[in-house]
């Protein structure tokens, strides 16, 4: 997250996080809370009317490729997507994703989990940039789409 200063969120992640992160002021999550609360957030949704209930939030409800191009052409650091599997899938399908970082946890999840990739998704080839194991067994895998 140190390389990013702008956050893209989908509707569900925004709705959930907007009710939580503004309330975190201390403890082990305080650093992340300050970063996410202070950073510009762009919320991609076709159903929300407003995102004013979380500071520094802007609604994107129109042409996603044009909005992403405008964000990329602006000044600042990287743009990151937090959570939001539906948004990640849409960005990948539209070739709007420059890098994909997956956290691979050493567990097998059963029902109730939303899949990142749809069964009918178009084949997208990815190039492994790095794979970093953590002390908890999580692997942080970074990929770039091949174009």
Segments from the language model and where they lie:
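Enzymes that bind and transform nitrogen-containing heteroaromatic metabolites
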Residues: 1-147
């Amino acid at each position: 997250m140190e390389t990013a200063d702008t956050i893209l969120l989908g509707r569900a992640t925004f709705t959930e996080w907007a009710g939580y992160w503004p309330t975190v002021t201390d403890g082990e999550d305080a650093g992340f809370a300050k970063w996410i609360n202070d950073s510009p957030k762009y919320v991609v949704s076709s159903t929300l009317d407003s995102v004013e209930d979380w500071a520094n939030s802007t609604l994107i409800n129109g042409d996603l490729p044009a909005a992403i191009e405008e964000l990329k052409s602006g000044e600042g650091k990287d743009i990151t997507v937090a959570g939001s599997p539906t948004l990640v899938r849409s960005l990948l399908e539209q070739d709007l994703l420059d890098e994909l970082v997956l956290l691979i946890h050493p567990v097998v999840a059963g029902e109730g989990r939303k899949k990142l990739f749809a069964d009918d998704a178009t084949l997208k080839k990815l190039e492994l940039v790095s794979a970093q194991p953590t002390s908890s067994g999580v692997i942080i895998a970074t990929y770039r789409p091949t174009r």
